[in-house]
Amino acid sequence: MNFEAGYHNGISGTLNSWGGEQHVISRLVEQIRKYKPKVIVTHDINGEYGHPTHRTVPYVVINAVKAAGDKSKYKSSCNEYGICKVKKLYLHMYSKHTVNMSAYSKSAKELDYKTPFSMACVGFDKHYSQHNGWSMHSKAVKKYPSYKYGLYYTRVGYDKKKNDFFENIKNS
């Protein structure tokens, strides 16, 4: 989606530097409608350590998830892709309807028997602009465990097992 990286002045400053709130939401609505995800997982509503971009992302995602299922919103992408009613939205560190993704440290066949955490480390290693003294093993990163989430929105009911983002979602 090619938005300017950097440390902006709060949510409104970030949105302004990205072309305005409606522009940003419309771009994400278009992607949701195009790819039709069943589940979306995003940043902590407080931006983990308060980073303005990290705070802006869940704000945009929450609004885009609502709009993507509404045919009266962003009609151009609706005409091209139809609507998409996302089934579940998880926020990192969200305190309600918590999910502990303990499988984060277990190898997964879908990842060539690597752990999701090891794959996150590979991704972080590519995110050069964020290194500046950070590592996936630092105390600061461990303060915001990457396996703790909360179910912010659901169309399919609340999780009972609380260990699978796709719980209650039938294959389709």
Provide a role label for each language-model segment.
Residues M1-Y74:
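Active-site beta-strand->loop->alpha-helix modules in alpha/beta enzyme cores, enriched
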Residues A67-S172:
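The feature marks non-catalytic terminal segments
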